[in-house]
């Protein structure tokens, strides 16, 4: 889906001014149309749903003994139900955009009425005591809604790392939107990001870090839903260095409302060398994200290949880390 500033401006105006009873059916139609013309994205979604539900993938039936995640409550599912869930992911992705673009028009009371939560004390108590918190979040549900809710209803500063987008004017639009309209401290990924993120933590911010995809190619190798891949090491590194609690968080859309789930802090005590601790904690992040995602896999918005076998299924070159591991294995043999 090709985005432009003009398209987002129009979509934002419609989202803010149309009542949800009109906007949501429109988004549902648009999401369905996008899904039907997005063959690669459909394949990626189908593949990760097969992983999560323990279905045959690449001709292989998964071994339940090697499964590190809880199957969703509605498992097992049929192939027909799998196809329905692929459609639901696209619907959820459209709903994410609608909710995000509507946020600036909501009052504090309107936003607060839509929120329920569990485990919030793991985040709120340290934040209210002035301690920074690292929130490891997946591309899931509506994390911006929760960030805005924390800012408006609890007066807790929230910072977030964001990836660069092309063209530059589109990236600038997102920065302005998240900073000025949502009240977030937005830190672009780049050479100074690590220093800025550490500064936000030391200032007592809740630091939201998307942790389910390695966008830079230099992440940490972990087991994630049954296959080795890489995830960002930043959340673990920041928590280990700063002493800030690291909490896995997901925000679920439930009808007209949102439900935030905050898991207990992960073990970020130093156990050995920093590199080994970062690997250990990042693996713990992966397992925690598995638990959160399995509560409703159709709200996970990963539309790009996330495992080496996804790249192979799409006919794409393997990520660089795969070849590096192969070469290391040969040199160690």
Write out the residue ranges for each language-model feature:
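Membrane-anchoring hydrophobic helices of lipid-metabolizing enzymes
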Residues: 1-137, 173-177, 181, 330-331
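Short, flexible loop segments at the rims of nucleotide/cofactor-binding pockets, characterized by
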Residues: 109-115, 164, 183-188, 225-226, ...
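A conditional alpha-helix N-cap/helix-loop micro-motif detector
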Residues: 113-117, 140, 167-168, 187-191, ...
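Conserved beta-strand termini and adjacent loop/short-helix elements that scaffold enzyme active sites
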Residues: 118-120, 161-163, 187-191, 263-265, ...
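Short Gly/charged-rich anion-binding patches and loops
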Residues: 44, 121, 145, 174, ...
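Active-site metal-coordination segments of metallo-dependent hydrolases
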Residues: 42-44, 165-168, 229-232
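Catalytic core of membrane glycerolipid acyltransferases/transacylases, capturing the structured
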Residues: 88, 129-190, 217-220
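Non-catalytic C-terminal accessory region of glycerolipid acyltransferases
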Residues: 37, 83, 87, 127, ...
């Amino acid at each position: 889906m090709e985005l432009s500033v003009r398209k987002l401006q129009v979509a934002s105006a419609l989202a803010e001014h149309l009542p949800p009873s009109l906007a949501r059916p429109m988004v549902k139609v648009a999401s369905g149309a996008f899904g039907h013309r997005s063959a690669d994205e459909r394949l990626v979604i189908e593949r990760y749903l097969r992983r999560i539900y323990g279905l045959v993938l690449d001709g292989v039936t998964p071994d339940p003994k090697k499964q590190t995640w809880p199957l969703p409550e509605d498992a097992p599912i049929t192939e027909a139900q799998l196809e329905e869930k692929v459609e639901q992911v696209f619907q959820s992705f459209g709903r994410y955009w609608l909710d995000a673009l509507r946020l600036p028009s909501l009052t504090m009371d309107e936003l607060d009425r839509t929120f329920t939560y569990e485990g919030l004390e793991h985040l709120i108590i340290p934040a209210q005591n002035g301690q920074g918190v690292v929130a490891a979040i997946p591309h899931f549900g509506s994390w911006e809604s929760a960030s805005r809710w924390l800012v408006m209803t609890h007066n807790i500063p929230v910072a977030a790392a964001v990836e660069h987008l092309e063209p530059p004017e589109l990236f600038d639009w997102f920065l302005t939107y998240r900073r000025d309209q949502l009240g977030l401290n937005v830190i672009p990924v780049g050479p100074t990001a690590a220093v800025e993120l550490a500064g936000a933590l030391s200032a007592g911010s809740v630091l939201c870090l998307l942790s389910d995809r390695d966008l830079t190619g230099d992440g940490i190798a972990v087991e994630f839903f049954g296959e080795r891949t890489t995830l960002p090491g930043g959340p673990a590194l920041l928590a280990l260095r700063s002493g800030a609690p690291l909490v896995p968080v997901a925000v679920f859309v439930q009808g007209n409302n949102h439900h935030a789930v905050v898991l207990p802090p992960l073990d970020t005590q130093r156990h050995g060398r920093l590199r080994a601790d970062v690997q250990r904690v990042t693996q713990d992040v992966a397992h925690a994200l598995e638990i959160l995602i399995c509560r409703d896999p159709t709200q996970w918005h990963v539309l790009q290949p996330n495992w080496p076998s996804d790249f192979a299924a799409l006919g794409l070159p393997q990520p660089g880390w795969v070849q590096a591991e192969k070469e290391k294995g040969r040199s160690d043999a």
